[in-house]
Amino acid sequence: MLKLLLDEHISAGVANGVHRRNRSLVVHSMVQWESGNFLGKEDSVCLLEAAKQRLTLVTYDRRTIPPLLKVWAEEERSHGGVIFVDEKTISPADIGGLVRALISLVDEAGGMDWTNQVYFLRSGH
């Protein structure tokens, strides 16, 4: 089952919007998750705790996360999955667009095991 953790650069409004459209879906904003204790922490620390909680990270960060995932794959370390969003496809300011794309993805693939999955989100999913 897909459970989402939105990175700290994604508006908490996205988590609220996704939750309004699908109340059964677990979705956390990094700001609210674990009382904000992971804000500003290293990516590896956040990914490790997210994996423990079976959360899939949603992020625009295509600079630091991909190299980390490569290292983890080489070390045979598991993560809870990562969904990348491209700002040219869905602007960070387009809260409604990101909500719609995530809901579409959940409707289509929310039941699969997201462990170690990497997905590139498209507009409208």
Ranges and model annotations:
Residues 2-8, 12-24, 28-34, 44, ...:
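Acidic, PIN/NYN-like endoribonuclease modules and their adjacent C-terminal/linker elements
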Residues 35-51:
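TIR-domain catalytic/interaction hotspot
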Residues 50-51, 55-72:
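Acidic, metal-binding active-site segment of PIN/NYN-like and related structure-specific nucleases
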